[in-house]
């Protein structure tokens, strides 16, 4: 096998590979000899089939394996001999307009096998000194007021409702049980029908104006509710349209008294109110800590990004941009918006998000090298914990989810990647100065200028929610 490097420009490499016909012939004969004792052909005793006859029967299929193995061997030899770190799998190219002829002649052992191997390699760079980097960690502890607000919400959400006396009118805060059928321009639409639906008036669960028109209704009343779907409604086909709902009221119930006491705590599995307060405070604090971590990580990645400037593999940038851009287009579609609605153009947005893709690739390479240099590993136990956490998100489908990940190495790698990234981030945090800064809740949850979906090297962080206490209530209840 003859391998000649023909191109070495930046991160691109090209090699010309030639396997002479006589070498292919030798490889073919070797393979045929290897299968001689394994095949059974009528008229011949096992192991006594002449190689010439084997060649006549199996020659072309065996040669196909020989050619594939030769291509793989060439790739491995190039990478090993040159000490290359590949960005993506090698690309194999045959001379234009001659590919079929070359392959057919090689299959018949009548010609050389010649092809190009095109590679893209990872850049080499030195890890930067971070001793001069100082970043802020925003700190916020749950206040008694926030804990009490969460308890009040939990008490309200868990309160009981008692039927109002016969003929009583529904008031704001009451729960009504209704059947409804919605129509636009006289035609029913998908998702516009419901039976025995419980609705708390004033909760703003339904579209604006719907609940207000049921205040004063009695059991047995039939009402025509007229509303307009918001212009930014998530179902694009309904956004901005007028609709009418035929509503039948089947029950009216008044809310019971909300008490924050030991009985409330017991409803949430706690021994007493103090234990519930501790659980709520811990859950709210965990939510604040998660948001603080998200911002700390972004500031750290910003600092890292400013420390490095090296060539990026174009193919990796292209892949990353394609993934980011698909998210952008899907988001616009879901919201029924255009680039013009957002005050920009498609071209300007593409330029902006290409820079974001480049940042993500650059930071991904930096974090990978930091992890490799520091010998950071993710154990199988840690991956299993992440897998079981994911499985718990799909009650009733546990076995299907488990089998999916165990039979899909790529999916399992996607569970491992954020674990590795967080370990690397922790390692880097140990190399910089972290200064704690007490802040308000508003400051902690203030949005950054850069889109949240693309702040990190791997974009694994979720967008934070202002309703952190609601999430904390769920955690405390769980």
UniProtKB/Swiss-Prot annotation:
A Gene Ontology molecular function term of the record: protein folding chaperone
Organism from which the protein derives: Methylorubrum populi (strain ATCC BAA-705 / NCIMB 13946 / BJ001) (Methylobacterium populi)
Gene3D superfamilies, alphabetized: 3.10.50.40, Trigger factor ribosome-binding domain, Trigger factor, C-terminal domain
PANTHER family (UniProt xref): TRIGGER FACTOR CHAPERONE AND PEPTIDYL-PROLYL CIS/TRANS ISOMERASE, TRIGGER FACTOR-LIKE PROTEIN TIG, CHLOROPLASTIC
Residue numbers spanned by region Disordered: 154-173, 444-478
UniProt catalytic activity: [protein]-peptidylproline (omega=180) = [protein]-peptidylproline (omega=0)
Cell cycle as UniProt keyword: yes
Every PPIase FKBP-type domain range: 173-258
Localisation per UniProt entry: Cytoplasm
Comment on protein domains: Consists of 3 domains; the N-terminus binds the ribosome, the middle domain has PPIase activity, while the C-terminus has intrinsic chaperone activity on its own.
Keywords, sorted A to Z: Cell cycle, Cell division, Chaperone, Cytoplasm, Isomerase, Rotamase
Protein name (record): Trigger factor
Record's function text: Involved in protein export. Acts as a chaperone by maintaining the newly synthesized protein in an open conformation. Functions as a peptidyl-prolyl cis-trans isomerase.
Any one GO CC term of the record: cytoplasm
């Amino acid at each position: 096998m003859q391998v000649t490097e023909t191109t070495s420009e930046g991160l691109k490499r090209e090699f010309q590979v030639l396997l002479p016909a006589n070498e292919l012939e030798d490889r073919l004969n070797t393979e045929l000899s290897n299968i001689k004792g394994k095949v059974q052909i009528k008229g011949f005793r096992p192991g006594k089939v002449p190689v010439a006859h084997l060649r006549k029967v199996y020659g072309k299929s065996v040669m196909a394996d020989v050619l594939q193995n030769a291509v793989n061997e060439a790739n491995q030899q190039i990478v090993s001999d040159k000490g290359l770190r590949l960005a993506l799998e090698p690309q194999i190219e045959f001379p234009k307009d001659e590919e079929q002829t070359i392959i057919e002649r090689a299959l018949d052992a009548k010609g050389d096998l010649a092809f190009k191997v095109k590679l893209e390699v990872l850049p080499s760079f030195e890890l930067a000194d971070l001793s001069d980097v100082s970043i802020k960690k925003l700190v916020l502890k749950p206040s008694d007021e926030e804990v009490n607000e969460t308890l009040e919400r939990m008490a309200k959400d868990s309160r009981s409702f008692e039927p109002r006396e016969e003929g009583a009118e529904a008031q704001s805060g009451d729960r009504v049980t209704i059947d409804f059928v919605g129509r636009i321009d006289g035609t029913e639409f998908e998702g516009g029908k419901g039976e025995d639906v419980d609705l708390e008036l004033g909760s703003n669960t339904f579209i604006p104006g719907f609940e207000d028109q049921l205040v004063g209704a009695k059991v047995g009343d039939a009402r025509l509710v007229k509303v307009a779907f918001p212009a930014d409604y998530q179902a694009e086909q309904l956004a901005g349209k007028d609709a009418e709902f035929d509503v039948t009221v089947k029950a009216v119930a008044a809310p019971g008294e909300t008490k924050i006491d030991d009985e409330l705590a017991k409803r949430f599995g706690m021994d007493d109110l103090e234990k519930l307060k501790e659980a709520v405070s811990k859950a709210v604090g965990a939510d604040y800590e998660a948001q603080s971590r998200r911002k700390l990580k972004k500031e750290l990645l910003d600092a890292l990004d400013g420390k490095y400037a090296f060539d990026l593999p174009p193919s990796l940038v292209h892949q990353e941009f394609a993934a980011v851009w698909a998210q952008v287009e899907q988001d616009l579609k879901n919201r029924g918006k255009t680039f013009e609605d957002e005050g920009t153009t498609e071209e300007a947005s593409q330029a902006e998000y290409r820079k974001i893709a480049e940042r993500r690739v650059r930071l991904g390479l930096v974090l990978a090298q930091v992890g490799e240099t520091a010998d950071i590993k993710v154990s199988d136990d840690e991956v299993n914990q992440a897998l079981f956490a994911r499985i718990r998100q799909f009650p009733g489908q546990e076995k299907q989810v488990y089998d999916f990940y165990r039979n899909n190495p790529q999916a399992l790698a996607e569970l491992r990647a954020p674990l590795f990234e967080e370990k690397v981030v922790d390692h880097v945090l140990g190399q910089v100065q972290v200064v704690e800064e007490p802040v308000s809740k508003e400051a902690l949850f203030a949005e950054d200028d850069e889109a949240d979906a693309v702040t990190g090297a791997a974009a694994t962080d979720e967008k934070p929610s202002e309703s952190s206490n609601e999430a904390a209530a769920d955690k405390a209840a769980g």
